[in-house]
């Protein structure tokens, strides 16, 4: 899990910024929702070999573990019709978030195993 600290720190910062911003503007006509998808099958995956963890992503691609982008968009659209601040557009995103939050040691073992 090399060279991921900047990515992880910036992702965490953007997530909490979005959550707080949503609370700050709740009484206005502005709507903020943080979207937390799992790895999604997008053109970005074509650049997988240029990342620091190509093996983990290639494994996910080969095993069909990437989320369908249309399903992700469908869930985002549904959640926009609610008061949700955070959108987890796939069951994989929900599972990953819960495992990381409640079982951090197990989460990091999974990450290391798949890296």
Residue locations for each model-derived region?
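Active-site loop immediately N-terminal to the catalytic Tyr-X3-Lys motif
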Residues: 1-5
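Catalytic tyrosine of NAD(P)H-dependent dehydrogenase/reductases that use a Tyr as the general acid/base
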Residues: 7, 15
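Active-site helix of classical SDR
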Residues: 10
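Conserved alpha-helical elements of the SDR catalytic core
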Residues: 13, 20-21, 25
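SDR active-site lid
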Residues: 23, 27-91
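A transmembrane-helix-recognition feature enriched in membrane-embedded lipid enzymes
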Residues: 84-115
């Amino acid at each position: 899990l090399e060279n991921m600290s900047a990515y992880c720190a910036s992702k965490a910062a953007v997530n909490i910024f979005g959550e707080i911003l949503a609370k700050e503007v709740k009484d206005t006509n502005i709507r903020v929702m943080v979207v937390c998808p799992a790895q999604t099958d997008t053109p970005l995956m074509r650049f997988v070999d240029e990342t620091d963890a190509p093996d983990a992503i290639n494994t996910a691609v080969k095993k069909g573990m990437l989320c369908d982008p249309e399903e992700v968009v469908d869930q985002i659209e549904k959640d926009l019709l609610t008061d949700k601040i955070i959108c987890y557009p796939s069951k994989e995103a929900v599972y990953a978030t819960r495992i990381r939050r409640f079982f951090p040691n197990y989460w990091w073992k999974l990450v290391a195993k798949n890296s």
